[in-house]
Regions:
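Hydrophobic membrane-insertion alpha-helices, especially the h-region
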Residues: 2-32
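A small/polar (G/S/T-enriched), proline-flanked helix-loop surface module common
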Residues: 36-199, 203, 210-229
Length: 229
């Protein structure tokens, strides 16, 4: 695994969990409302925000020729530190399936890598440690990443913004059957998306520290859930 930047000041932590709303102390995406109207899109779908995720990554989850419906909350995570949410539903035969769900928000501190509740891991599961201090729990289809982002805030910035030190990117990748992906391949696509988005947000936020974000995702040895549920 290669690393984009290295610094003792920067931290990047990857955590994966089963359900976003089950993570202790991180109910911020419960506020993410004001979602726009869902409308059909032709694959590859338009990105949720400015270039993220890439259409190429999205297409890997889809397989050929699927239609999409997108819902998203306003993209205010950079300026206002407001949680943002985006979801893609794909129309398959006679049903609509969730293909991708993404959340962006800020936090004062990330959960500890060995905290199974905060990480969404199961009791007894151990984090895998990679270069650059990246920790990952390979559980289900959610990939969650926290990275430190120091920003020169104006003196009149609200206290909650001044206290936010970490950006959280959460991606739930759920491939369609027509994509013909194995669980391991689905995990790899999800991790690639997390890093795509994290690098983009870091650039937009103007982090003054070295974020220590890897350029490429850690190698996936296995994935332990049936049919991505």
């Amino acid at each position: 695994m290669s690393v984009a930047r290295t610094s003792k000041r920067g931290k990047a932590v990857v955590l994966a969990g089963a359900l976003a709303i089950a993570v202790a102390g991180l109910g911020v995406w419960l506020w993410a409302g004001n979602e726009g109207e869902a409308k059909p899109l032709s694959a590859p779908a338009n990105p949720c925000w400015d270039g993220m995720p890439s259409q190429g990554s999205m297409q890997k989850l889809l397989g050929p020729g699927n239609k999409f419906f997108i819902s998203k909350s306003p993209y205010r995570v950079i300026k206002d530190h407001w949680p943002s949410h985006c979801a893609y539903d794909a129309e398959s035969d006679d049903r609509v399936e969730l293909v991708l769900s993404m959340h962006l928000s800020w936090a004062g501190e990330p959960p500890k890598a060995d905290d199974f509740q905060a990480a969404g891991a199961l009791r007894g599961d151990k984090a895998k440690t990679f270069d650059a201090g990246v920790h990952a729990y390979y559980l289900k289809a959610t990939n969650r990443l926290y990275f430190q982002c120091d920003v020169d805030q104006p003196k009149d910035a609200p206290e909650y913004i001044r206290n936010d030190k970490y950006v959280m990117v959460d991606v739930l990748a759920h491939p369609m059957d027509s994509a013909h992906l194995t669980a391991k391949q689905a995990r790899e696509v999800g991790l690639d998306m997390v890093l795509e988005v994290a690098h983009k947000v870091a650039d937009q936020a103007g982090c003054t520290n070295d974020t220590n974000l890897p350029k490429t995702a850690p190698q996936v040895a296995d994935a332990n859930w049936p049919r991505y549920h």
